[in-house]
Amino acid sequence: MHYSFTEKKRIRKSFAKRANVHNVPFLLATQLESYHGFLQEDKIPSQRKNEGLQSAFTSIFPIVSHNGFARLEFLSYVLGDPPFNIKECQQRGLTYASPLRAKVRLVILDKESPTKPVVKEMKEQEVYMGELPLMTSTGSFVINGTERVIVSQLHRSPGVFFEHDRGKTHSSGKLLFSARIIPYRGSWLDYEFDPKDILFFRVDRRRKMPVTILLKAIGMTPEQILENFFVFDDFALHADGAEMAFVAERLRGEVARFDITDKAGKVLVAKDKRINSKHVRDVEAAGIKNISVPEDYLLGRILAKNIVDKETGEVIANANDELTEDLLARLREGKVTHIQTLYTNDLDQGGYISQTLRMDDTTDQMAAKVAIYRMMRPGEPPTEDSVEALFNGLFYNADRYDLSAVGRMKFNRRIGRDELTGDMTLSNDDVLAVIKILVELRNGRGEVDDIDHLGNRRVRCVGELAENQFRAGLVRVERAVKERLGQAEADNLMPHDLINSKPISAAIREFFGSSQLSQFMDQTNPLSEITHKRRVSALGPGGLTRERAGFEVRDVHPTHYGRVCPIETPEGPNIGLINSLALYARLNEYGFLETPYRKVEGSKITDQIDYLSAIEEGRYIIAQANATIDKSGALSDELVSAREAGETILVSPERVQYMDVAPGQVVSVAASLIPFLEHDDANRALMGANMQRQAVPCLRPEKAFVGTGIERTVAVDSGTTVQALRGGIVDYIDAGRVVIRVNDDEAQAGEVGVDIYNLIKYTRSNQNTNINQRPIVQVGDRVAKHDVIADGASTDLGELALGQNMLVAFMPWNGYNFEDSILISEKVVADDRYTSIHIEELSVVARDTKLGAEEITRDISNLAENQLARLDESGIVYIGAEVTAGDTLVGKVTPKGETQLTPEEKLLRAIFGEKASDVKDTSLRVPSGMVGTVIDVQVFTREGIPRDKRAQQIIDDELQRYRLDLNDQLRIVEGDAFQRLEKMLIGKVVNGGPKKIAKGAKITKEYLDDLDKYHWFDIRPADDTSANALEAIKESIAEKRHQFDLAFEEKRKKLTQGDELPPGVQKMVKVYLAVKRRLQPGDKMAGRHGNKGVVSRILPIEDMPHMADGTPADVVLNPLGVPSRMNVGQVLEVHLGWAAKGLGLRIGEMLNAQVQIAELRKFLAAIYNESGKTEDLDSFSDAEILELAGNLKNGVPFATPVFDGADEGETRRMLDLAYPDHIAKQLGMTASKNQVTMYDGRTGEAFERTVTVGYMHYLKLHHLVDDKMHARSTGPYSLVTQQPLGGKAQFGGQRFGEMEVWALEAYGASYVLQEMLTVKSDDVNGRTKVYENLVKGDHVIDAGMPESFNVLVKEIRSLGIDIDLERD
């Protein structure tokens, strides 16, 4: 068993019963692969597949001019290097993007050529096509300086769908069937039955028309239409009746309208009897081929063909005419002996198409097309050309109609064709085939489709969404190019004169910047990032809307199994519309979700793993992952629980064809992080999964004692941690950098084998949380490829650590944990367990106004000296300054116009001169309620504006830091090269060298030490190999130096060039504050099982309930929060966490007692190897065992995987191991070791009942009271009503609503009520009067008329009622 460097340091004991047969795939693969498929940036043009950008270009090009003598052809495209890296884009507020250039060829044909067209001239050129945003390695985009995610969309797959209205449309409850052909791009074609069983069609949900109009428009005659939809009855006409060709099947179930006799005249079926199977057999046995029928049997039947008089050529009757006595007489006159009628019945062969044809008054193909034209373009006069163009453009033109490969595959599969490929447009056969199936459905044969089946919904990922936008932009370009191509020949234009890239840039910018699917990345913690990128939304353009989505779409469907998580979805209006991908799910080539299964052959489980889509899964019988397997790998139960076509069944093992790969394959990443999920109610699990995403990273992350084993995968895949790209030995570390000397076998020849990893330090995330990486390796450690070498936010030794392990006691305490309130020990706050750092970005811009430019300066009047002390000479705050609300961060003055001066201002003007009056102070100040430390300042200056001293100093510091960084890198690189050189040279024979070394002498270490290192290259080894290697290393060092010099120059150029700022902005200053948030009453906290609450009180440690040995609880929770919520998982977590801590304490005691290593190994083996997954501890050296034990002494981490976790017996065994009887007695534990006698900290008396105590991983959520607490005395007022604005963001007031007024009325508090409704709200004159009275020292309220009353009066006047106040 292989352990990575960090896994060895702390092994998580797993209780999994089943071996891991299939690793969890890379969690961000969906996003990265999709966008990579779109760009195909690493492939040479000739090897690119026809998808993504390539497909968009080839679908639009070549563009041909209107006269056909000029065309523009696409050859290839190339993506340039992005001008700025990700970090620079974030700082400057730019988009991380690459310039796209397309190589196009303009071909002009010779108009004068008498024969076929001859090429007159060709011009090739690379044309700029705009910028394409690039995806970062973690699957996000940097757009205008902020990280965004493009959420995948779950939409209805293109293809054909058959459904009915479930009897809701018509009062009789009759099922009305309909079909819809949905293309990827183009017009929708709907077919629908009405209550009278007439079949209609509509295009793009316009007015409905009889379907036979469409059939005529595609060139079918009424005869052909009837032939396609009906079978015919043949009749031979006689003078006094007729003879019907006998078809036995058609008679069964009919009521005989006459006696049926055999040749001898024996009655086989009497009149008015229902014909059954026996009757049919009798008739067949009698050898009857034709049956004589009376005249009235023909009446009312429908003719199948036109009947023409053979002599005159006159049409006697048309197809679809009803037979009447008159018509029969005419037929006999015309000597017609043979007729065919439609066979219909009321049960399973309705005459729907015939009835529809009767409604249709169009006569021929052209008339039908004109009718469609009038429906599509009402009011426009139809001409033959326009009618043809419109009809052919609807479904038959590849430019306007695209079914897509998915649509064609789904279409062909649904209508029963074998081949899954074909044209991307509709054919006449397609149109007809859908109508045939719809008629069959109405006749009672076949099944309608389930729209919510995941075989009918597909996922559109980033790549596909971006491709659609790019194509839309290209289409706009195409129109412009077509017009200009005509002039290309005359004006001698080049390709770049024809193509304007603006429409493309606009389409791309609009999509990434403001599309509903382009979302501001949730960056609270690593889990929220990863979940956001794995989200699948049914909303967005081309999707559903919240209001229209019904219950069925939102519900969990059997096909979600292993594809979409049934648990993780938001509460509220989006429930069920936004989902998360299941852990193992992936997309197939068509965009359908697939999940892996193990192949089972003859009840034997094989190692073959197949990914099945929802469509394929329906054909197989699939067993669950927890089915019992014997030692030979076969299913051992007599009956196995399995799924077939969405139903759970019990089957014999031989019938099973597949088996789940893992018990947790049903759920998403967030849900799979909840231990004992199987014991939680689904609603609470949903809250638990959602709340983990809101956990704020703590100052010191702590791994969960009870996890599920997937924490490491999440931390690594999220990109928060730093992984080694190649194996090697750690050469150097500091807080911001790790340097690894690469193993010889992994380093490439001639390359300098050093990898340098720069860590992210104290960076602001999108949610203002702090992102900070810290190294977890030491100098000299040997690491392998992909080992974790640095932890990020919310990770501990390469594992996700969202919260802290708290000692929890379930007991009431003086009402402080009533209704989910949480009582917390002061020790938790004192130890900074839940302290988090938040980084706030405050910015100020200096604009060029009409009255003159704003100025950032230290010279501000009326600013106190203690405020000025924090500002430097440029007026910008120092780094490291501790600031509180109202402190000035950046001094700024704005010119103001000449206004009427107040007497006070006149006085100031007289004293201080001009300056005081013509500018006003608009400095950047710390907002209310914020206290923090300035950690960074950035100054951006527009090109051409002189930089102030602070801006120049920031640039100089940055360059100096970069130069030191490069020098360090060079030192490390050279040191490594000289080490390799020394190894290679010692003992080699030389031909000569510095310090007059003799020819044939061997190089010694002393000789090399005596030489200056750069003179080593002057040594001339005798063998050519060494000489070449020496030369190669010399060149590689020179090359590296050259590269570093170039990099420094590039950096200097970037820093010294002006910044791109919005129009009118001269200068921008950004100040970053680090705010420390400690836990306080009002903060929201939660466990992982949906058990949320608000901190009600922080209690001194001496008052907390404690155990017999004096250990106080950290958190006291209300036991009543568990039973009704049915999230028992939290109690099981507490028991197992209690064991985890106890085992850690036992290991700590052993280490303190310095026991023999063998004894320590024995104890570790008892923990790890007696149940669940076993660990190979024998492969560990003694030093590694000691390091492992040292990391375990705070608690042994457990993994209890979802649906495959620890059972009661295992938990008890761990408790027995952790708390031997003598220790249990000291702690006052019960015999079962899962409860403890607690003592009141205030009185020292024991509580009446034993209490469940243990460790729970508890999280602090992002709903912090600091962000919500807000107070105001005076502030902004609404313009219309003059009432205070609402909300913290507007610095608003607290609404005193209707019910609050009732409360004051109930108490009779009339004065309070009066001031609430007048001076504290919208009595403008009253407000100013209160100020005046207060200044005079007179505390009297003069209430006047509230402004809202005036608004009411105005509103009534607007209705035309003259209302006025009677004034005394």
UniProtKB/Swiss-Prot annotation:
EC id: 2.7.7.6
InterPro entries according to UniProt = DNA-dir_RNA_pol_bsu_ext_1_sf, DNA-dir_RNA_pol_bsu_external_1, DNA-dir_RNA_pol_su2, DNA-dir_RNAP_su2_dom, DNA-dir_RNAP_su2_hyb_sf, RNA_pol_bsu_bac, RNA_pol_bsu_CS, RNA_pol_bsu_protrusion
- Is Transferase among the key words of this record? yes
UniProtKB keywords: DNA-directed RNA polymerase, Nucleotidyltransferase, Transcription, Transferase
Record bears the keyword Nucleotidyltransferase: yes
Instruction: Please provide, in alphabetical order, the Gene Ontology terms of the cellular component aspect for this entry.
Output: DNA-directed RNA polymerase complex
Provide the GO MF annotations for this entry: DNA binding; DNA-directed RNA polymerase activity; ribonucleoside binding
> Its biological function?
DNA-dependent RNA polymerase catalyzes the transcription of DNA into RNA using the four ribonucleoside triphosphates as substrates.
Q: Assembly state and interactors?
A: The RNAP catalytic core consists of 2 alpha, 1 beta, 1 beta' and 1 omega subunit. When a sigma factor is associated with the core the holoenzyme is formed, which can initiate transcription.
Q: What is this protein called?
A: DNA-directed RNA polymerase subunit beta
Q: Which organism is it from?
A: Janthinobacterium sp. (strain Marseille) (Minibacterium massiliensis)
The primary gene name is rpoB
